[in-house]
Amino acid sequence: MSLLNCENSCGSSQSSSDCCAAMAASCSAAVKDDSVSGSASTGNLSSSFMEEIQGYDVEFDPPLESKYECPICLMALREAVQTPCGHRFCKACIIKSIRDAGHKCPVDNEILLENQLFPDNFAKREILSLTVKCPNKGCLQKMELRHLEDHQVHCEFALVNCPQCQRPFQKCQVNTHIIEDCPRRQVSCVNCAVSMAYEEKEIHDQSCPLANIICEYCGTILIREQMPNHYDLDCPTAPIPCTFSVFGCHEKMQRNHLARHLQENTQLHMRLLAQAVHNVNLALRPCDAASPSRGCRPEDPNYEETIKQLESRLVRQDHQIRELTAKMETQSMYVGELKRTIRTLEDKVAEMEAQQCNGIYIWKIGNFGMHLKSQEEERPVVIHSPGFYTGRPGYKLCMRLHLQLPTAQRCANYISLFVHTMQGEYDSHLPWPFQGTIRLTILDQSEALIRQNHEEVMDAKPELLAFQRPTIPRNPKGFGYVTFMHLEALRQGTFIKDDTLLVRCEVSTRFDMGGLRKEGFQPRSTDAGV
């Protein structure tokens, strides 16, 4: 019932108060009828639904005109409706206002019923045709408002929860996060192949039964489940008590010193054993001569015989211990000789491998993340490569990598890379000082067809000490670059893979320098004698 109809029904003879009373009663009846019919109609919105739906909270381009703005939520009209008094509202906003604040227009307080609202399809079409910006951070696309919902479904910058850790990420980042960064991503133990979440791996590594651990006494590497038996039975340097500790010897020594201890303290052990036998003898004597116990009579004929047998056995065991000690010392000498032989053979194998590289050596530096962390904590990091030869015969060289500290002057946070000459097998047959060209390269480990290696080429300078024949195993003077590569460039590229950095050194002596020259590299100045 409109206000106009209410005024006409009142008549001129009635007072204004009677008119208002009739109008209020009519409105109350209309609200009651409308509320009943609304409960069965799908066109009306539930209160909980209306609380969630307001206007379009998006950024318009150009900015939204005020005529399309809802006076209640101050956002763009959603499902625009118009009142008899000519005002526009979001459908959900005005229905909620009527039900919460009373049957009146929020703008001019005119009487307003729900059944008086009618859709403003013209405004709806106009608003849906306006251009808006995607609200997702990083997305620069613009589209009509009617297409925004479909765009957000496929937008690569929309936030979605990681299915494993439930943290929000943009769609374009979630796959990388799941594979590389998610604390709940599945990883396998390299030792026992058990699958677990990444965040649980550190705890698992501390208790994995198949993980390699180092014996704290002898340095032997064993799997964790073997370590208890190793401590109890095998470890040569594990501390153990004397065999005669039960008789009163309180000495503790390494297991490999036990035989010597037994040999050097035989007399002491015999005295302790005799004292223990004497104490047993006293314990077996009757405490009361008037009422001797039959079970502990000293005149038992087998008692003294048993003591004699035990003493005889002790003498034999003492001789056996001496013999075993002598054998063990002999075997220890053999083992020492075998260890020296093995060490010599290992050195020869390493020397032969170094001679096979023919002047091209790739140095694999593992656990490089640990070295970077040490550098960030301002702990010096200096690493030397194994030696390698330029040929057979050839010069023996090695590389030195130094991570400069953040506080270093003029070279802070740089990788310094140098080459050192070493004493080699063929030094007496080679011309000195060393002359040639050296190419140093940090390899790009990406899968790209064209890899962006970082490399420098330098010529040897015979007048420097770095290229003279070394008089000690490794020449203390090096030749190379203090500022070979900045650590920031290293981190931004794909130079580190599986926590490993690859450094390549290619050496051409004065007899085969043509290969490097043909590639057009011009050496830059180096930092000599560092």
UniProtKB/Swiss-Prot annotation:
CDD domains per record: MATH_TRAF6, mRING-HC-C3HC3D_TRAF6
A molecular-function term among this protein's GO annotations: ubiquitin-protein transferase activity
The keyword Zinc is assigned to this record: yes
Record family assignment: Belongs to the TNF receptor-associated factor family. A subfamily.
PANTHER family recorded: TNF RECEPTOR ASSOCIATED FACTOR (PTHR10131), TNF RECEPTOR-ASSOCIATED FACTOR 6 (PTHR10131:SF152)
Keyword Transferase (UniProt): yes
Record-given protein name: TNF receptor-associated factor 6
Region (Interaction with TANK): 363-530
Chain intervals for the UniProt region annotation (Interaction with TAX1BP1): 1-362
Recorded catalytic activity of this chain's protein: S-ubiquitinyl-[E2 ubiquitin-conjugating enzyme]-L-cysteine + [acceptor protein]-L-lysine = [E2 ubiquitin-conjugating enzyme]-L-cysteine + N(6)-ubiquitinyl-[acceptor protein]-L-lysine
Zn-finger (TRAF-type) residues: 150-202, 203-259
Gene Ontology BP annotations: animal organ morphogenesis; antigen processing and presentation of exogenous peptide antigen via MHC class II; antiviral innate immune response; autophagosome assembly; bone remodeling; bone resorption; canonical NF-kappaB signal transduction; CD40 signaling pathway
RING-type Zn finger ranges: 70-109
Binding partners and assembly: Homotrimer. Homooligomer. N-terminal region is dimeric while C-terminal region is trimeric; maybe providing a mode of oligomerization. Upon IL1B treatment, forms a complex with PELI1, IRAK1, IRAK4 and MYD88; this complex recruits MAP3K7/TAK1, TAB1 and TAB2 to mediate NF-kappa-B activation. Direct binding of SMAD6 to PELI1 prevents the complex formation and hence negatively regulates IL1R-TLR signaling and eventually NF-kappa-B-mediated gene expression. Binds to TNFRSF5/CD40 and TNFRSF11A/RANK. (Microbial infection) Interacts (via N-terminal RING domain) with Toxoplasma gondii GRA7; the interaction plays a role in GRA7-induced pro-inflammatory cytokine production in mouse macrophages.
Keywords, sorted A to Z: Coiled coil, Cytoplasm, DNA damage, Immunity, Isopeptide bond, Lipid droplet, Metal-binding, Nucleus, Osteogenesis, Repeat, Transferase, Ubl conjugation, Ubl conjugation pathway, Zinc, Zinc-finger
PTM note: Sumoylated on Lys-124, Lys-142 and Lys-461 with SUMO1. Polyubiquitinated on Lys-124 by TRAF3IP2; after cell stimulation with IL17A. Polyubiquitinated; after cell stimulation with IL1B or TGFB. This ligand-induced cell stimulation leads to dimerization/oligomerization of TRAF6 molecules, followed by auto-ubiquitination which involves UBE2N and UBE2V1 and leads to TRAF6 activation. This 'Lys-63' site-specific poly-ubiquitination appears to be associated with the activation of signaling molecules. Endogenous autoubiquitination occurs only for the cytoplasmic form.
Pathway as given in its UniProt record: Protein modification; protein ubiquitination
Numbered residues of crosslink Glycyl lysine isopeptide (Lys-Gly) (interchain with G-Cter in ubiquitin): K124, K327
The protein's role, per its UniProt record: E3 ubiquitin ligase that, together with UBE2N and UBE2V1, mediates the synthesis of 'Lys-63'-linked-polyubiquitin chains conjugated to proteins, such as ECSIT, IKBKG, IRAK1, AKT1 and AKT2. Also mediates ubiquitination of free/unanchored polyubiquitin chain that leads to MAP3K7 activation. Leads to the activation of NF-kappa-B and JUN. Seems to also play a role in dendritic cells (DCs) maturation and/or activation. Represses c-Myb-mediated transactivation, in B-lymphocytes.
Recorded GO CC terms: CD40 receptor complex; cell cortex; cytoplasmic side of plasma membrane; cytosol; glutamatergic synapse; lipid droplet; nucleus; perinuclear region of cytoplasm
Phenotype on disruption: Abrogation of IL-1-induced activation of NF-kappa-B, MAPK8/JNK and MAPK14/p38. Animals appear normal at birth but become smaller after one week. Show runting, failure of tooth eruption and die after three weeks. Exhibit severe osteopetrosis, thymic atrophy, lymph node deficiency, splenomegaly, and have alopecia and lack sweat glands.
